[in-house]
Regions:
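Active-site beta-loop-alpha junctions enriched in small/polar residues
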Residues: 87-89, 120-122, 142-146, 182-184, ...
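Auxiliary Fe-S-binding modules of radical SAM enzymes
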Residues: 2-14, 192-302
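Surface-exposed amphipathic alpha-helices with a cationic face
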Residues: 109, 132, 165-174, 255-259
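Conserved Radical SAM active-site core
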Residues: 1-138, 146-150, 160-161, 172
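Hydrophobic faces of well-ordered beta-strands that scaffold small-molecule active sites
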Residues: 29, 82, 115, 139-141, ...
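Generic structural signal for well-ordered alpha-helices
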Residues: 102-105, 128, 163-167, 191-195, ...
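Glycine-enriched alpha-helix->loop->beta-strand junction motifs that scaffold or abut catalytic
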Residues: 133-139, 199-204
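Conserved strand-turn element in the central/C-terminal portion of the radical SAM core barrel
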Residues: 156, 168-189, 240-244
């Protein structure tokens, strides 16, 4: 029975299997405890899901709470990459009420899977007890600005301050963490400033360029024209004329930053492991849609 809670249309959805074979290059499984995402990010690539789910509502205004049969044999996924939150955020605000992600984590205990949780929330701190039991687990927070006003223009998720605080708590609990600088907005995102804030509390520092396609391209281009008119020509050059020189220059800057802070610089870091504090692995995912398989090509600064 559909109901509206705090302005969000909530439905329930039955699914035969919560574990979906992934089409991503890294393989494994994608697991999404919800359909939709109420963070309502203006640049969200996952909004394409409406084509398959039949939702007519605006992206960010609905959420389907999935129900699935209990995972009876978690060891089936031993050694597999399991990505939680590829087209939703398992820690959207409604998770506090429905608890789907916590239930999922409980069912995966003993799986020995390589679990990656992608989020923009600090609610994940609630589940540190389970994360410790899971073993090989990584938690990634998307942070592409330190400017809360810009963040608020782009999404309704947890503040940047709360995300960074959550990252610190999870890191100090002995769990591998990622700062995912995504998407990098040309002329707006200062990834070195972000790095300086988080370098002592993350194992990996991922960089990904802003991709504009589909319906949200116009949304972002109009936003830039209205809020950052001086950047209009740059965005036109990158997103209409497909000039790559800006992000190519950022790759050079990222490599220089890696040398400055004595950090590895790679272009596809997926293996599980921890690193010395203050020296996270910097991962270049610019134009990742053209990458690169599952193996690291070995592009390093040392």
């Amino acid at each position: 029975m559909a109901e509206v809670i705090n302005g969000i249309l909530i439905n329930e959805a039955e699914t035969k299997n919560i574990m979906t074979k992934s089409s991503l290059p890294v393989g494994g499984y994608s697991v999404n405890p919800y359909v939709g995402c109420t963070h309502a990010c203006k640049y969200c690539y996952a909004s394409f899901m409406k084509r398959f789910t039949g939702h007519k509502e605006e992206w960010g205004t609905f959420l389907d709470v999935k129900h699935w049969p209990e995972i009876k044999n978690p060891k089936k996924y031993a050694g597999q990459r399991v990505v939680i939150g590829s087209v939703t955020d398992g820690y959207n605000p409604q998770e506090e009420q429905f608890g789907n992600t916590r239930k999922l984590l409980e069912q995966l205990i003993g799986s020995d899977a390589d679990i990656l949780i992608c989020t923009k929330s600090d609610l994940v701190v609630r589940d540190i007890d389970l994360l410790k039991k899971l073993g090989r687990v990584t938690v990634s927070w998307s942070i592409n600005t330190l400017d809360e006003n810009f963040k608020n223009d782009m999404d309704s998720a947890s503040s940047i301050e709360r995300r960074i605080s959550a990252m610190k708590q999870v890191y100090e609990a002995g769990i591998r963490t990622v700062c995912f600088v995504s998407p990098v907005f040309p002329g707006i995102t200062d990834f070195e400033a972000i790095f300086e804030q988080v370098k002592d509390q993350c194992d990996l520092f991922w960089l990904e360029n802003l991709n504009l396609r589909g319906g949200f391209k116009k949304t972002i281009m109009d936003y830039i024209a209205g809020k950052y008119p001086d950047l209009g020509p740059l965005y036109d050059e990158i997103y209409n004329k497909h000039n790559r020189s800006y992000f190519e220059a950022l790759e050079v800057k990222a490599a220089e930053m890696a040398k400055k802070y004595d950090c590895p610089f790679v272009d596809n870091e997926m293996l599980y492991g921890r690193v010395p504090q203050g020296h996270p692995v910097i991962v270049d995912y610019f134009y990742h849609e053209e990458i690169r398989g599952t193996e690291n090509t070995g592009k390093r600064n040392r």
